[in-house]
């Protein structure tokens, strides 16, 4: 998979479809990689130049020493567009990717035709809760948070 350098991170990305068509970039949620968008990639690549990337610290992208900021994640997207010589794109982000999309819409609107934010908020959780969750994963792996993650994403009848 191709990578490029954005500030201090190696960002993994992949493109699908014809680069002469309108660009559409997908941004993953916390704890996932760009493959979460596979159904959308398959559908949209006929009509769009689809760009997917792993947010820094996720998937095959590097995880330089943090902390990370939404400003930094947004700039990674702009740097990716620059790397691919894409002037303007549509953007779709979910959860953490949606936070990135909000930053892009506010700070770099000239680079985006549309910004779609899914399952996100202006602020998600408190800093200490995220720090505690990260420490738990570092110490014990993903298993301790797996069941609580499923309950946040799906209703009881679905699980």
Regions found by a protein language model. Give the residues of each.
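Short acidic-hydrophobic surface loop/beta-edge motif
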Residues: 2-6
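Short, well-ordered alpha-helices that flank and scaffold nucleotide-derived cofactor binding pockets
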Residues: 39-42, 46, 79, 106-110, ...
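Structured helix-beta-strand junction loops
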Residues: 46-47, 87, 140
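Conserved HGGG/HGGXW glycine-rich cap/lid loop of the alpha/beta-hydrolase fold
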Residues: 7-66
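Conserved acidic catalytic loop of the alpha/beta-hydrolase fold
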Residues: 71-89
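Conserved hydrolase catalytic core segment
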Residues: 83-126
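Alpha/beta-hydrolase-fold catalytic nucleophile elbow
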Residues: 54, 118-119, 152
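Conserved alpha/beta-hydrolase catalytic His-Asp/Glu region
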Residues: 125-129, 139-159
């Amino acid at each position: 998979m191709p990578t490029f350098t954005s500030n201090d991170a190696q960002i993994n990305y992949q493109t699908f479809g014809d680069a002469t068509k309108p660009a559409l970039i997908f941004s993953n949620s916390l704890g996932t990689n760009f493959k979460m968008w596979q159904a959308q990639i398959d559908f949209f690549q006929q009509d769009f130049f689809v760009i997917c990337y792993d947010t820094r610290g996720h998937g095959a992208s590097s995880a330089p020493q943090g902390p990370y900021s939404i400003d930094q994640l947004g700039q990674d997207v702009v740097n990716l567009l620059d790397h691919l010589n894409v002037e303007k794109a549509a953007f779709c982000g979910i959860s953490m990717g949606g936070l990135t999309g909000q930053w892009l819409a506010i700070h770099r609107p000239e680079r985006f035709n549309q910004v779609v934010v899914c399952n996100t908020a202006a602020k998600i959780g408190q800093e200490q809760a995220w720090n505690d969750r990260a420490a738990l994963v570092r110490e014990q792996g993903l298993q301790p948070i797996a069941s609580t993650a499923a309950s946040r994403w799906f209703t009881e009848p679905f699980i």
